[in-house]
Amino acid sequence: MFETLVEVFLGMTAGQLIKLIPSTLFQELAVETKVDAQVKKLSGEVMFKLIVFSMLNSNKLSLRVMETFLQSAQFKSFSGYDILESRYNSIRDRICTINAEYFEKLFASIFAIYNKELNEEKALTKTDSTYIALAAKLFSTGMENGDNNKRFVKYSVNLKGSIPSSVKVFTQQRYISEDVALSEVINENEGLKGNTVVFDRGIQSRKSFENFTDSGKWFITRSKLDIRCKTATKKEITNKPAGSTVTIISDEIGKLISGRAVVTNHDYRVIKATIDSSGEPICFVTNMLDEDVYLIASWYKQRWEIEVFFKFIKQHLNANFLVSRDENGIKVMVYMTMILSILIIAYKKINNIKGYKIAKLRFELELDSELIKEIVILCGGDPSKAAHLFSSA
């Protein structure tokens, strides 16, 4: 259904990695989205570079931090713009009013570049959601979720291979249901056609299963143990491979029956197993009727990679802190978080770095070295004479 990926990377500096993004992309999308219409100072490209630079160089991002960086020599060198003067309130207003579609399209374009660079075009997709909590007195339009003093912003992500391929931000109460939120994220992602997506028990709606199958999207999920299935075929269980962490008990194909006794049009596969380490029973549901049963179980196990991704962006990219409480501003910052995560994850994989913390630190240091080299050249010097100072090996 999709290829097992073989990672063979020769290494790449942070500067080389960023240069994979065409310099013309910013202007092309600016024209397409009209992001710079009637704007003199804080163009879409400047805002993109300011947010990336500020996220990399600050442990807790704020508008004041961004204002300080905007006026710094380091950022002027990084962005290629010499004169940049704006107050924090101008930055705030720009984030709140800038066309978020510009950043959405940048995210989609940048994903496509690095998805190909990482050889992950046919990789498995994992889908899940996470929340950001805000004080109710500061953000009244978010979701309620059991705490009257807080409101929540939810964003749902498709993680294709190791990097995010799409994201949606939700603030309306009906999206508290994963059946609604995750189903929408999967249904709207045309790139999932002919590919496989894995998600947890958040989606149980038979209608969602039918929609995925109708649109040619393969899925694997976990279900309740008492799922109702009108069994038509009992498949023979294949030999358990070495390294498997579950033992398959049954493997059946049939039509699912909803709580209202509605029978699905398509056949689905219900796989029951036990987790070897705990003896806990587990049930999988999929519309992949022919794949090896233990292979399906191993693919479902990869779902945990998106939990690791959420932990990474919250711990190292400050995804829990919102610079803007305006819905448009929140979308801009979420798209930018996704873009920066792509850069760091790609850098980590290409250079075979184990931890996210060290990958982010080395990425930052290499960009600093690039800035120093540019300053040396501007002053008439030759950075190659001190090449040993710029080595991150």
Region locations from a protein language model:
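Single, function-defining residue in the core of a domain
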Residues: 1-63, 102, 121-122, 130, ...
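"Short basic amphipathic alpha-helical interaction patches in structured regions
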Residues: 65-67, 140-143, 213
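Short coil turns linking two alpha-helices in DNA-binding domains
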Residues: 84-87
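Active-site-proximal, Lys/Arg-enriched surface segment
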Residues: 90-159
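DNA-recognition alpha helix
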Residues: 61-80
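N-terminal, well-ordered alpha-helical segments
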Residues: 48, 52, 64-68, 89, ...
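A generic secondary-structure signal
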Residues: 69-73, 113, 184-188
